[in-house]
């Protein structure tokens, strides 16, 4: 989960056999207590299920494709998470999946997120 500027708020790493919508439920429950200021989350159609909507008091707005869309089109809000993934993958350690455990993968994602924040702070200082 990231804010509209691409800063990481919450991370949840799980195995590849977990569907996005199923992984969203524990993520939203975790974020509810830690980030009570979040009122609305934007998501793609993979998260359009009643189970996700009922998991939290955070409003879920599904950003759908345009009706007349053909080919690739940048959608408002959907690209923010993908951009954050691209920034995180610039970290050499995250370029490939070297981690043996989910805990270590999560830790390195948080470390990469912290480095992004430090770079932003240094840029504005």
PLM regions: where:
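Polybasic low-complexity intrinsically disordered regions
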Residues: 1-57, 61-65, 109-113
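Basic, amphipathic alpha-helical segments enriched in Lys/Arg and hydrophobic/aromatic residues
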Residues: 62, 71-125
